[in-house]
């Protein structure tokens, strides 16, 4: 019996690099930053979000600043 062909996963493209003028990463933009936080309150990994290394670093810094300013929670409220 023949094996099924192995598919490579589709490469994710950094949304910030793709559309440069659309959005900048700012700690006050909580709706954007919530997309990069898991339901447990952790910052999602690069391989999950598809961001490039520079923009992933910027997102992480913005999330940490927003947490410090009490705009985002450190942990989730779900139990």
Swiss-Prot record:
Keyword Membrane applies: no
> Single Gene Ontology BP term?
translation
Keywords assigned: Ribonucleoprotein, Ribosomal protein, RNA-binding, rRNA-binding
Q: Identify the InterPro entries for this entry.
A: Ribosomal_bS18, Ribosomal_bS18_CS, Ribosomal_bS18_sf
Indicate whether Flavoprotein appears among the record's keywords.
Answer: no
* Entry GO CC: cytosolic small ribosomal subunit
Bilayer-crossing residues are none
Q: Pfam families given for it? A: Ribosomal_S18
An example molecular function term from Gene Ontology annotations? structural constituent of ribosome
Tell me the subunit arrangement.
Answer: Part of the 30S ribosomal subunit. Forms a tight heterodimer with protein bS6.
What is its biological role? Binds as a heterodimer with protein bS6 to the central domain of the 16S rRNA, where it helps stabilize the platform of the 30S subunit.
Q: Which family does it belong to?
A: Belongs to the bacterial ribosomal protein bS18 family.
What protein name is recorded for this chain? Small ribosomal subunit protein bS18B
The source organism is: Saccharopolyspora erythraea (strain ATCC 11635 / DSM 40517 / JCM 4748 / NBRC 13426 / NCIMB 8594 / NRRL 2338)
């Amino acid at each position: 019996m023949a094996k099924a062909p192995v598919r490579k996963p589709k490469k994710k493209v950094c949304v910030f690099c793709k559309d440069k003028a659309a959005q900048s990463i700012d700690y006050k933009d909580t709706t954007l930053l919530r997309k990069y936080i898991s339901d447990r309150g952790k910052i999602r990994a690069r391989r999950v979000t598809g961001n490039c290394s520079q923009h992933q670093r910027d997102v992480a810094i913005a999330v940490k600043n927003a947490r410090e300013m009490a705009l985002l929670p450190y942990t989730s409220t779900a139990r």
